[in-house]
Amino acid sequence: MGLTSQLIPTLVCLLALTSTFVHGHNFNITIKEIIKMLNILTARNDSCMELTVKDVFTAPKNTSDKEIFCRAATVLRQIYTHNCSNRYLRGLYRNLSSMANKTCSMNEIKKSTLKDFLERLKVIMQKKYYRH
């Protein structure tokens, strides 16, 4: 009985550490996938890259990453209505949504091209990857 009561706290601590490691590992994999998709998308020169989208990256400095990812995912979801739905945009949307708030405000007035939007998102994700 004495040995079991000593093992329980140790096992709980190990379980907590393992789940933190797995979450961090999955997070890095998601960021790597996003960067890979962004590299592929920004190398393309099709008409979809010239679409005008909201510039969600002009948000105030104190905006959280989850809020920025939510806004970026919202922009990507809106692109689907322009017949630009390809597997990389869908995958990018799915991965960003998994890292984002469920809802967010979209008050941006400034606009940019989809290509510029994706380039800026790539820089943000690369910084996040190297920080993490």
UniProtKB/Swiss-Prot annotation:
Its main location: secreted. One of its GO terms (biological process) is positive regulation of T cell proliferation. SUPFAM superfamilies: 4-helical cytokines. Glycans are attached at N28, N45, N62, N83, N95, N101. Keywords: B-cell activation, Cytokine, Disulfide bond, Glycoprotein, Growth factor, Secreted, Signal. It is found in: Secreted. Disulfide bonds join C48-C84, C70-C104. GO terms for cellular component: extracellular space. GO terms for molecular function: cytokine activity; growth factor activity; interleukin-4 receptor binding. InterPro entries: 4_helix_cytokine-like_core, IL-4, IL-4/IL-13, IL-4/IL-13_CS. Residues 1-24 form the signal peptide. It comes from the Eukaryota. PROSITE patterns: INTERLEUKIN_4_13. Belongs to the IL-4/IL-13 family. Participates in at least several B-cell activation processes as well as of other cell types. It is a costimulator of DNA-synthesis. It induces the expression of class II MHC molecules on resting B-cells. It enhances both secretion and cell surface expression of IgE and IgG1. It also regulates the expression of the low affinity Fc receptor for IgE (CD23) on both lymphocytes and monocytes. Positively regulates IL31RA expression in macrophages. Stimulates autophagy in dendritic cells by interfering with mTORC1 signaling and through the induction of RUFY4. This is Interleukin-4. The gene is IL4.
